[in-house]
Amino acid sequence: MTTQSYLSRQVTLTVQGQRLGGLAYVPRTASSTPAPLVICCHGMEGSHTRVAPMARRFAAAGAVAICFDFRGGGGSASQGETTAMSALTELADLEAVLTAACAWPEVDASRVALFGLSLGGAVAALAAARHPQRITALALWYPALRL
């Protein structure tokens, strides 16, 4: 498989009045030809660093890849309390990232995938069910499907 070079940049959004942070990995070729989008979701006690290796692999394969911290996540670049986290607050975070990233000029918004680990997998599945017209692929790694 041919790998592509990519740039990394910090991502900051405001969701329900709180900061949400993470990283985006953008293939250099996406500036001239929009690329598919993959949003990577970490598990309950994790942070974006847990799924960042997968995001970098997706970027090397030619996709714009984002890994972010759910608000309240452990070691989080985002605001919020862990005790306030739920699948629904994480779903709101994911939907905010999805909406923002689909507006980026580097992203082909007709090709969007979600990757989720553990609780992030359950949240990714919820988002895919809620937005079937926007999300075209779903990859779940040990998803917490019994909520």
Region locations from a protein language model:
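Alpha/beta-hydrolase active-site loop
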Residues: 50, 84-104
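N-terminal cap/lid segment of alpha/beta-hydrolase-fold proteins
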Residues: 1-31
